C-alpha cells in the first residue's frame, strides 16, 4: 500500500504495517458497509499474525483525513496458503449495522415512525439516528419473522427512506440525498465515467390502492412529483416511451392515507432516480458515501450537475486509493407472487373496543403470544344498522386470517371450540339435525330438525317453542300482553283460562302445555 494508512485492531495499530497488501471498503444503500483487509501472513503452520478474532473492532484511517474510512467489527478471518508456503490473511469486518441482521425478536412497536424504530433498534450499538424525514406514523408494528435489519429496511423502504452509517450515526434519507455536493471533475478527480439515460423503469406517477384492515375502509393515494437529488439539465420524458401513465400497486394493507402516500412516493422516487445514472472511478475520498450528493463537472452540459450516490467501493492498494461510485437506485425486487394470506389461532384478551367498532383484542400463541391488537371480527350481514353481532369473549379461541402474513392486519374469522366440548353438537343418527346458538349465560335459540321444533329460551326458564302440533309461550316471570291503542284478538275453537298459582320450571311447563292441548282436543 503506497499511501499512509492507519489500521487499528481493538484500538492498537498493526504491529507490522508493511504486511498490509490491500484494503477494500464496500458500502451501498440499506446494507452494512463491509471492509476486507488483506495481509501477508506467517507461512506454514505458524500462528495467525495479527492474532485477530471475530468480534474485534477494526478502524481504518487515511493520512491527513479527519474522518475514518471505516469503523466496524470483525466477523470472519481467513487464511489462504499457496504451494510455496506463502500465506495471506483476510480479515472481513462490517460496520455496526451488521448486528441488526443477527437479531430477531418477537415484539410489538406501538405508534412508531421509521426514525423512532431506528432509534429503538440501534440502542446499544453506539449509533445515533439522524433522519431527513421521519416517515409516516404506524399505529402498530409486529416483529415476528424479520431480523431487526429486515424490519427496519422494510419500514423505511415503504416510506421511501434509505439507511447508511456515517461515522457514529445512522442516517435515514430519501433519494434526494444529503449534504453539500462534493465536486468531482472528469480528467482531474474522476478517471473514468459512464452516464446512462435509461427509461426502462420510467413512470410519470405512482398510485397505491389498499384498505384499512380494522376499519374495512378503502384507501388510495397518488404521488406525482419525485424526491430526487439529481439536478441536471437533461430531463427525460417517460412519455417518449409510452410510460406517461400511472403505475398502481394494489391490495396494500395500511392504517392511514399517510402510509399509502409514502409508499406511492417511494415507488416514484426510485423510478425517477433510475432515469439518468452515473458510475465511475474517482480519486479516493472517505467522504464519498451512499446518500452523499456529488457535483459532476468536465462532462457535456446536459449531464453535468448534482447526483446522489447509492453505492461506493473504496480500494487502497499499491495503485493508491480509488473510489468506484454509482448513483443507480436499488432495483425492484424479483417479480414474485404477493405474500399469501395465512390463518392462525388467536386468543381473545379483550372485547371492550375503545373505538366502539366491534373489534376484539387478540394474542397469537403461534407467534410467541404477540399482541396483534384490536382486530376486526367477521360478522354475517354486517353493514350500517344491520347484521349479526356475535363477538367472542375473553379467553375464547379464534381463527385469524392474516392478509399478506402480517399479524397487525389480521381479521377474526370466527371462534373455535378446540379442545372444549360443544354444549350441543346437534348430531342425531350421524347427521347434523340441530342448530343452536347460546350465550355464555344461557340465553338460547335452537332449530331442531329432529324434533321439528324452534325454541327461543332465556336462562331464567322462559321460552317460546314452536312445534307442528303445539306452540307454547311460557313465562318464568310475570307475563304482560300489551297493545296500547290497538286491538287484541284471541281466536280459537275454544278459549280456556286456567288458574296456576305455583311457578313451574321449563320442563314441567312444556309437559303441562302438551297435556292441556290434548285435553282440549288438540295435538
PLM regions: where:
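Juxtamembrane "anchor/assembly" segments of surface/extracellular structural proteins
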Residues: 1-54, 94-98, 185, 194, ...
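Amphipathic, non-transmembrane alpha-helical segments in extracytoplasmic/periplasmic proteins
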Residues: 32, 37, 53, 93, ...
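Surface-exposed cap/loop segments at beta↔alpha junctions
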Residues: 46-132, 141
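Short, solvent-exposed secondary-structure boundary/capping segments
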Residues: 78-93, 279, 315-328, 356-361, ...
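Short beta-strand-centered interaction patches in the first periplasmic/extracellular domains
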Residues: 81, 88-97, 133-200, 409-416
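Surface-exposed, non-catalytic interaction/assembly patches
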Residues: 101-108, 157, 166-240, 264-281, ...
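Right-handed beta-helix
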Residues: 119-121, 153-155, 198-200, 208, ...
Amino acid at each position: 500500500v503506497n499511501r499512509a494508512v492507519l489500521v487499528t485492531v481493538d484500538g492498537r495499530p498493526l504491529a507490522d504495517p508493511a504486511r498490509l497488501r490491500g484494503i477494500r471498503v464496500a458500502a451501498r444503500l440499506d446494507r452494512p458497509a463491509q471492509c476486507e483487509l488483506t495481509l501477508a501472513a506467517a507461512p506454514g503452520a505458524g500462528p495467525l499474525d495479527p492474532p485477530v478474532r471475530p468480534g474485534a473492532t477494526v478502524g481504518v484511517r487515511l493520512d491527513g483525513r479527519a474522518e475514518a474510512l471505516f469503523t466496524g467489527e470483525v466477523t470472519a478471518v481467513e487464511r489462504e496458503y499457496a504451494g510455496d508456503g506463502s500465506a495471506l490473511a483476510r480479515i472481513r469486518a462490517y460496520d455496526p449495522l451488521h448486528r441488526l441482521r443477527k437479531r430477531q425478536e418477537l415484539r410489538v412497536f406501538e405508534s412508531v415512525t421509521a426514525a423512532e424504530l431506528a432509534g429503538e433498534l440501534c440502542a446499544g450499538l453506539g449509533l445515533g439516528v439522524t433522519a431527513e424525514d421521519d416517515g409516516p406514523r404506524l399505529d402498530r408494528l409486529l416483529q415476528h419473522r424479520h431480523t431487526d435489519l429486515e424490519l427496519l429496511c422494510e419500514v423505511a423502504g415503504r416510506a421511501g427512506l434509505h439507511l447508511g452509517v456515517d461515522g457514529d450515526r445512522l442516517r435515514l434519507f430519501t433519494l434526494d440525498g444529503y449534504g453539500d455536493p462534493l465536486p468531482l471533475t472528469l480528467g482531474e478527480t474522476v478517471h473514468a465515467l459512464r452516464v446512462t439515460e435509461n427509461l426502462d423503469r420510467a413512470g410519470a406517477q405512482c398510485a397505491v390502492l389498499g384498505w384499512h384492515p380494522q376499519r374495512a375502509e378503502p384507501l388510495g393515494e397518488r404521488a406525482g412529483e419525485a424526491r430526487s437529488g439529481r439536478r441536471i439539465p437533461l430531463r427525460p420524458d417517460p412519455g417518449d416511451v409510452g410510460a406517461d401513465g400511472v403505475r398502481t400497486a394494489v391490495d396494500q394493507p395500511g392504517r392511514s392515507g399517510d402510509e399509502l402516500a409514502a409508499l406511492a412516493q417511494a415507488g416514484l422516487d426510485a423510478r425517477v432516480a433510475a432515469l439518468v445514472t452515473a458510475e465511475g472511478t474517482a480519486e479516493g475520498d472517505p467522504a464519498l458515501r451512499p446518500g452523499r450528493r456529488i457535483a459532476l463537472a468536465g462532462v457535456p452540459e446536459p449531464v453535468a450537475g448534482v447526483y446522489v450516490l447509492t453505492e461506493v467501493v473504496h480500494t487502497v492498494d499499491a495503485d493508491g486509493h480509488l473510489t468506484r461510485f454509482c448513483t443507480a437506485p436499488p432495483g425492484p425486487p424479483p417479480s414474485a407472487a404477493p405474500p399469501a394470506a395465512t390463518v392462525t389461532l388467536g386468543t381473545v384478551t379483550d372485547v371492550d373496543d375503545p373505538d366502539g367498532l366491534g373489534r376484539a383484542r387478540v394474542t397469537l400463541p403461534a407467534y410467541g403470544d404477540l399482541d396483534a391488537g384490536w382486530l376486526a371480527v367477521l360478522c354475517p350481514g354486517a353493514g350500517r344498522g344491520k347484521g349479526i353481532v356475535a363477538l367472542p369473549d375473553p379467553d375464547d379461541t379464534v381463527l385469524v386470517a392474516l392478509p399478506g402474513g402480517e399479524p397487525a392486519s389480521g381479521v377474526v374469522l370466527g371462534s373455535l371450540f378446540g379442545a372444549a366440548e360443544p354444549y350441543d353438537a346437534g348430531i342425531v343418527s350421524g347427521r347434523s339435525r340441530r342448530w343452536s346458538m347460546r350465550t355464555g349465560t344461557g340465553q338460547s335459540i335452537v332449530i331442531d330438525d329432529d324434533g321439528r321444533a324452534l325454541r327461543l329460551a332465556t336462562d331464567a326458564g322462559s321460552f317460546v317453542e314452536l312445534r307442528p302440533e303445539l306452540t307454547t309461550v311460557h313465562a318464568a316471570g310475570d307475563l304482560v300482553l300489551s297493545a296500547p291503542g290497538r286491538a287484541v284478538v284471541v281466536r280459537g275453537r275454544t278459549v280456556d283460562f286456567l288458574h296456576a298459582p305455583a311457578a313451574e320450571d321449563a320442563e314441567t311447563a312444556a309437559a303441562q302445555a302438551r297435556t292441556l292441548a290434548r285435553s282440549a282436543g288438540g295435538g
